[in-house]
């Protein structure tokens, strides 16, 4: 079959179960596409040809023995922030260019246990710090919809790989929008779960109180299959929550749209910089949900203007602490011929970290310094609590909250944006991480440049099933999630 990459995750799993094709054939099909197309997209940092085929053969043997799970033999790819035993894990940085993890991240372990086949590791902004995937030491990833545009970030490689049909689904991480914004830019469905729902063990840390792993795929149904694999308590992660996990696939039609109250924050649709076409597509999608039975309710989120300054104090502060371990002594990049220990530290970090990572470490170190700790970091944590309370108050009257996922569609690679302009592009996504809430991006149309627009739905704690169900039902009645990027259509 030449069009295996056009099938959904469910169709791939059913095809394997019915012996329409083998996991080896399916895996080889994707590897061939990667070899053919990815030189243009640059979504993969590492392609694991031999290991993938070995995993596929093992999956086929399990099926023949009658011991396979539903997803056994389906391929996926991991963001290069999840540790993979025996495979390079770089976090997109020169600092970890030669790091081979001695263990698997829990997310990778769960994927392996489900019989999923790892195609490789996906490009990302360095240490997940960025919104474009341009800060990667391995070069910028291109948006499959327009190769001169960014795919978003930091999970840009994950989004680009799925959008170009170089993987059926992929893992991502989200610290301030790093699943939802690239999903929006690349026309995908992407879910950021409640903080603590997915294990962070073996996931290289950026900002520990904000980071959360999640799935990226074409549809809510495909995301639900990967969430069933990823979610759950992990004793190795002290922030993982002991709470029963839903069957996200079984619950895809469980949420009634009739009477569902969707909050429309008046502040969100009056943000300076919100593109008129993005606003129009999002409003059209909300009208469609209204036609399907939902009720739109205007709400007030008075803390909106505090999102960006609060996030860009807390996240860099945590990054400053987390990245202090990369000193050129124990592991990571080490400079050549240091004069003394201080020179080793300074040069290893200056040469090993890129400009954006250095910028955030400096901001974070300043915010944590003795004279400014109370004025900046402690105050930001107090405002963070107010942001959380703002959301909880809103959820007393509505079931979910709607917003654009990003104020614009994908911009040009190399666009002359200042760091502040780049940070303001995260206005709609940051608060979800500050509050620890779940949120999902759904593709809802294209702009006049044929670039995807995304709708973000924010849920109350532990409402991942509800979010997936709403988007799934929307996708049963629309075709935006089935539209394919130019490079995927050209190489169908």
Curated annotation (Swiss-Prot):
PROSITE patterns: AMIDASES (PS00571). Keywords: ATP-binding, Ligase, Nucleotide-binding, Protein biosynthesis. GO terms for cellular component: glutamyl-tRNA(Gln) amidotransferase complex. Heterotrimer of A, B and C subunits. This is Glutamyl-tRNA(Gln) amidotransferase subunit A. GO terms for molecular function: ATP binding; glutaminyl-tRNA synthase (glutamine-hydrolyzing) activity. The keyword Nucleotide-binding applies. Its EC number is 6.3.5.7. Pfam families: Amidase (PF01425). Belongs to the amidase family. GatA subfamily.
């Amino acid at each position: 079959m030449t069009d295996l990459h056009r099938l959904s995750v469910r169709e791939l799993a059913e095809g394997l179960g019915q012996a329409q094709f083998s996991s080896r054939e399916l895996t080889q099909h994707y590897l061939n596409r990667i070899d053919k197309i990815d030189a243009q997209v640059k979504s993969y940092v590492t392609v694991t040809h031999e290991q993938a085929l070995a995993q596929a053969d093992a999956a086929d043997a399990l099926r023949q023995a009658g011991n396979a799970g539903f997803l056994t033999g389906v391929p996926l790819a991991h963001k290069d922030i999840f540790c993979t035993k025996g495979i390079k894990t770089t976090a997109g940085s020169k600092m970890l260019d030669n790091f081979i993890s001695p263990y698997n991240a829990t997310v990778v372990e769960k994927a392996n246990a489900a019989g999923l086949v790892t195609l490789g590791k996906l490009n990302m902004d360095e240490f997940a710090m960025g919104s474009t995937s341009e800060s990667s030491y391995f070069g910028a990833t291109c948006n499959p919809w327009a190769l001169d545009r960014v795919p978003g970030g930091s999970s840009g490689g994950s989004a680009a790989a799925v959008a170009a049909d170089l993987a059926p689904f992929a893992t991502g991480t989200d610290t301030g929008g790093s699943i939802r914004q690239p999903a929006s830019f690349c026309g995908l469905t992407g879910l950021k779960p409640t903080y603590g729902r997915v294990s962070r063990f073996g996931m290289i840390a950026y900002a520990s109180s904000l980071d959360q792993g999640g799935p990226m795929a074409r549809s809510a149904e495909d995301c639900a299959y990967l969430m069933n694999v990823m979610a759950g308590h992990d004793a190795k992660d002290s922030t993982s929550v002991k709470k029963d996990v839903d069957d996200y696939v079984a619950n895809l039609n469980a949420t009634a749209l009739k009477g569902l109250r969707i909050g429309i924050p008046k502040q969100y649709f009056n943000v300076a910089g919100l593109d008129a076409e993005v606003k129009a597509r999002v409003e059209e999608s909300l009208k469609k949900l209204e036609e399907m039975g939902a009720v739109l309710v205007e709400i007030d989120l008075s803390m909106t203007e505090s999102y960006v300054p609060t996030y860009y104090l807390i996240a860099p502060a945590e990054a400053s602490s987390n990245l202090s371990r990369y000193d050129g002594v124990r592991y990571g990049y080490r400079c050549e011929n240091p004069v003394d220990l201080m020179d080793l530290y300074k040069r290893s970090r200056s040469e090993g970290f890129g400009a954006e990572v250095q910028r955030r470490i400096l901001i974070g170190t300043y915010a944590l310094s003795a004279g400014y700790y109370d004025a900046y970091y402690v105050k930001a944590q107090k405002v963070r609590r107010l942001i959380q309370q703002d959301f909880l108050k809103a959820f007393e009257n509505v079931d979910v909250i709607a917003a654009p996922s990003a104020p614009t569609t994908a911009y040009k690679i190399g666009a002359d944006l200042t760091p502040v302009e780049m940070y303001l592009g995260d206005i709609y996504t940051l608060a979800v991480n500050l509050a620890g809430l779940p949120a999902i991006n759904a593709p809802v149309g294209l702009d006049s440049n044929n670039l995807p627009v995304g709708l973000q739905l924010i849920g109350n704690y532990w409402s991942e099933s509800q979010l997936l169900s709403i988007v799934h039902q929307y996708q049963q009645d629309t075709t935006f999630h089935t539209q394919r990027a130019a490079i995927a259509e050209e190489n169908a």
